[in-house]
Amino acid sequence: MPPPLASTTSSFASDGENYLGPVSATPHLMCERIVDAILPSSLPKGHHRRDERKKDIEVFDIGCNDARVLITACQKYKNVRGVGIEIDPVAANNARNNVRNSKLENRIEIREQDAMTVTDVHRAEYIFLYLLPKGNEKIEKILRERMNDRCRIVCYMFKLPDRLEDDKFWSKRLIKEVAFDDSRKRERKGVDTSRYNRIYVYGSKREMERREKIRKIVRAGVGVAIGIVLRNSMLK
């Protein structure tokens, strides 16, 4: 049985200063795709026994609704621990019940909390966001200030915005954008309104530094190769 869906309308005023968007659950098929995008495939799979030789991976879901993304991640990978932040009390209660029913209480923590007041986001190595553009605009400031150098972020549906045109902080970190024709496993024929649903993957600071080093090595290698070709052509 899939986890119950929380109400689609938040019980908090939509014009509040820290309002990030309505309560809305990620489709189950997209949960699987998001987990595959956010976590390395080298992690030990299965959720019954941890691999003591591997360190735990901290995943934060900001606006976690009924915790289905965190549950999917912990069920697929042994060494994943999750923290779900949810301001809506109904959704937070559903999340706790789903975590309990999945027997993952020792690995997933659900907080009924305003996401703008989270002070330990620096613990996260992976962060998932399914927020409206206005919500992404608000939360990105906190992520910039508090996330650690190893943190990778995955957004569903909407990108993280750059603050200024000449800033391009998030645009530079966008390493993957994947579009999916269907967000649900469909048992009946019908019109799918989710043809443009996308996942946006943002690399960590360390990832970007490694990529830049590789680019420099490749450029240097190409330069050397061109130099050799030119020199040989001149000797002929």
Put a short name on every predicted segment.
Residues M1-G46, R53, I57:
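S-adenosyl-L-methionine
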Residues D56-N65:
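Conserved class I S-adenosyl-L-methionine
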Residues R68-K78:
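Conserved SAM-binding loop of SAM-dependent methyltransferases across substrates and taxa
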Residues D88:
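Conserved SAM/SAH-binding beta-strand->alpha-helix loop
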Residues A95:
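Conserved SAM-binding loop
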Residues K103-D114:
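Conserved SAM-binding strand-loop segment of SAM-dependent methyltransferases
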Residues G135-E207:
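C-terminal substrate-binding/active-site "lid" region of AdoMet-derived donor-dependent transferases
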Residues I228-K236:
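Short hydrophobic alpha-helical membrane-entry/anchor segments
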